[in-house]
């Protein structure tokens, strides 16, 4: 994560986030509503456990009490029950990312769960939402797409695909003479 975008995200979280126990001057969680959230900030908010939502914010006002319904994709005024806006989540996985307090903890937890179940001879669990892969293209992959795909355990990746690299231990030996 770049320090400038992390700093900008931390500034936003400072006003809306929750204190992190035993970590001074840092917050997590919260919600961020925006008409358009730049991808670099959207991803950093996801990493921080915040809930970024792109929606029409023209009817939202400072200090207004709202009812946020992520499963319905609606924000309503708490006092009048007026529908303020509707939205669609970029991915259903965002719900798990918020529950896990960030994208990185979710990835780690999901991979540990998957590997443990595999070792125990159990089927993959359905407690996690999985990203949808929409690859219906018959085109081949570029070398870069194949390289990333190999790291993720698939043939290749396309723009917009979600993939997680398979991690293992790396050892480096340095000989002193």
Language-model segments: which ranges?
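Feature captures the catalytic cores and cofactor-binding loops of soluble hydro-lyases/lyases
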Residues: 1-76, 81-86
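C-terminal binding/interaction regions
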Residues: 83-97
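Flexible inter-domain linker/hinge segments
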Residues: 105, 109-152
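N-terminal glycine-rich anion-binding loops that anchor highly charged ligand groups
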Residues: 155-160
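Short glycine-rich or small-residue beta-strand-to-loop segments that form or flank ligand, phosphate
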Residues: 165-168
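Conserved small/polar residues in nucleotide/adenosyl-binding loops
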Residues: 174-177
